[in-house]
Amino acid sequence: AGDVITQVNGTEITGSSDLVSLVSEAAIGNTVTLFMAVSLGFTTVLVAAVRPLVGLIGVPAEAVPGTVQYLTICFIGIPFITAYNIISSVFRGLGDSKSPMYFIAVACAANIALDILFIGPMALGPVGAALGTTLSQTLSVIVALFGIRRHKTGLRLSRQNFRPRKGVLGRILKIGLPVAVQDGCIQVAFIIITIIANHRGLIDSAAVGIVEKIISAMFIVPSSMLATVSALSSQNLGAGKPERAAQTLKYAAMIATGYGIAVVLVIELVAEPLLGCFTTDAAVVLMGCQYIRGYIVDTIFAGIHFSFTGYFAACGKSYIGFLHNIIAIVLVRVPGSYLASRLFAGTLLPMGLAAPAGSLLSVMICVAAYRWMKRRGTLYTAA
């Protein structure tokens, strides 16, 4: 939702004398209608199908009850994730990329604090982890709502704006469908990797699960680069300043790389105590440290290809982001994780390295596509 409406609004309202046009209001209203309906539908279906899904992913028998509780709570939180993304995308589409960053910071800090509280002193286990995620998302929505009330956006949304319009929904889906399918494929890849880890036993499964929670927090900055670059680049392209859009990509990639290197260094130093915040099982901590020390390198490369994906979406070429992710998943991430799991039964480090290897391939594809289209003069062709 966030990337779709950010790009639609950014290209339509920037460069005009009136910041908010009727078209952008219709885009916002139709986005709310579309994505909230989809999120409620997904919530209903997933909560109803949670037990079959747990059986499908091969969760160890002793972990099934906790997994069912965890997923049920997380599925209930889907509408809150959607609401947060919609509100943040409105800010980005209007040129304010700082406010969503603050909302993300609140969610990140709350998630970490609540996870430590619920899983540590309160010993709630999987339920605590799920509550930490869902409550932090809810808090970010509340903060975002306060933010949008205080921010003078100039929006005048009426009931008409929320009524589905074929033309508006068509543009939203044209831009957003490749991004949505791309994200869906990434999540499917994560599920497959989780299944691979589950078949290695309870210790490895628990280690991978904890690391995924930590990685999700560490990835807030790299993943936000997609929407940020998309918003700023689309605004500059809409204002007829493609050179500034290219500079946005350049500096975003530099920031993402710097952040990734810093995170890698920190994790290398504090992996053991960090994992120890989530479990007292020495075996889980050991395997988790191996996995995260490989996986964390992905923060460097992922931030770069997220930046390129946002830039390509602003240029009306969101299909490139879809293609490079599919190629990386099919050729590297999933087969790499599977082979590492089979060939290195005593360590999770090689399995963790499959993720950054896939992202490195994505970066190579993005750079090649950028240079090729720039030479041909086709970068800024409208979608």
Task: Show the residue positions of the predicted features.
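Residue-level hotspots within pore-lining transmembrane alpha-helices
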Residues: 41, 45, 75, 79-80, ...
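C-terminal recognition in membrane/secretory proteostasis and scaffolding
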Residues: 1-36
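Short alpha-helical transmembrane segments in multi-pass integral membrane proteins
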Residues: 37-77, 121-177, 233-298, 341-383
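Small-residue-rich hydrophobic transmembrane alpha-helices
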Residues: 37-44, 81-100, 194, 207-265, ...
